[in-house]
Amino acid sequence: MATTSFDANFCAERLKAIGDPHRLKIISALRYGEMTVTDLAELIEAENMTVSHHLKILKYAKVVEVRREGRFMYYRLHEDLVGADSQKSMFLDLGCCRLEVPDRKA
């Protein structure tokens, strides 16, 4: 039997974490840089509380990371996951697969 070089349970948890329309919108928005909850809520047309809930799930799955500046929290895609190919397409390397993050401006 072949062995795998990745943690299937961890990968499944990450896939579950990104498998929500709000979270996919957040990931797409963060492609352009860090944002606050308020910025994200306005951009994806959701309530601040909803965005905070989804960011907590993404943070727990290590898809996003956060930094504090004064009283503001800035969220960004986890730097260990972000990559780009030769066509300047951005992706998240989840360890078991890659998620291409579409350019919403296109």
Language-model features and meaning:
Residues 1-6, 10, 79-106:
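Amphipathic alpha-helical dimerization/coiled-coil segments
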Residues 2, 9-47, 72-82:
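N-terminal helix-turn-helix DNA-binding core of bacterial DNA-binding proteins
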Residues 16, 56-59:
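A general lysine-centric signal
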Residues 28, 53-56:
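Base-recognition residues in the alpha-helical recognition helix of bacterial helix-turn-helix
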Residues 42, 59-60:
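Alpha-helical residues within the helix-turn-helix
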Residues 50:
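Residues in the helix-turn-helix
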Residues 60-69, 76-77:
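Beta-hairpin "wing" of winged helix-turn-helix
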